[in-house]
Swiss-Prot record:
Name of this protein: Large ribosomal subunit protein uL10
GO molecular function: large ribosomal subunit rRNA binding; structural constituent of ribosome
Cellular component, GO, one term: large ribosomal subunit
Gene Ontology biological process: translation
Keywords: Ribonucleoprotein, Ribosomal protein, RNA-binding, rRNA-binding
Transmembrane segments: none
């Protein structure tokens, strides 16, 4: 990389750090081009990205954005995975890493909280924001459904009592 290109590359990484509340740092040594392309396509469908970074530039960008705590994670063949939706991204990366031993999760950061490999794996087991929204809507609808059911049961019970009383007479 030319010296004149380095500030532009640092600025790109700084923008990723600023715009993405969640970043996973990986080692990609041994992944084939088709595997990396497959991962990128999967991430793109979830509005996430995968960027191979030069460690020194990633450290400079981390220091410029106040993410000093992740600077020590940049060693070896490093790529960052970034997204605005942390759980979906974590699920995708963890599943890809399970299927491809050559992708190693090193650590990451979610909403300014540094996570290690195990924390990211645990984090990937959480429900996504859309799943949580669906659960909340379901919980809110459940009482209304029960009230309607009770009202219907009461009216049908009342109708049966009246029918039984009418058939006696």
């Amino acid at each position: 990389m030319l010296r004149s290109e380095k500030p532009v590359a640092v600025e790109d990484i700084v923008n990723i750090y600023k715009e993405s509340p969640s970043i996973i740092i990986t080692h990609y040594h041994g992944l084939t081009v088709s595997q990396v392309s497959s991962l990128r396509e999967s991430l793109k469908s979830k509005e996430a990205g995968f960027k191979v970074v030069k460690n020194t530039l990633a450290k400079i960008a981390a220091n410029q954005t106040g993410l000093n705590s992740i600077a020590n994670l940049f060693a070896g063949p490093t790529a960052i995975v970034y997204s605005k939706e942390p759980v979906e991204m974590a699920k995708l990366v963890v599943n890809f890493a399970k299927a491809n031993d050559n992708l190693k999760i090193i650590g990451g950061i979610v909403d300014n909280h540094v996570l290690d490999e195990h924390s990211i794996k645990d984090f990937s087991k959480l429900p996504t924001l859309n799943e949580l929204r669906g659960n909340i809507v379901g919980l809110l609808q459940a009482p209304a459904t029960k009230v309607v059911g009770v009202l219907q049961a009461t009216s049908s019970s009342m109708a049966r009592v009246i029918q039984a009383h009418a058939s006696k007479n």
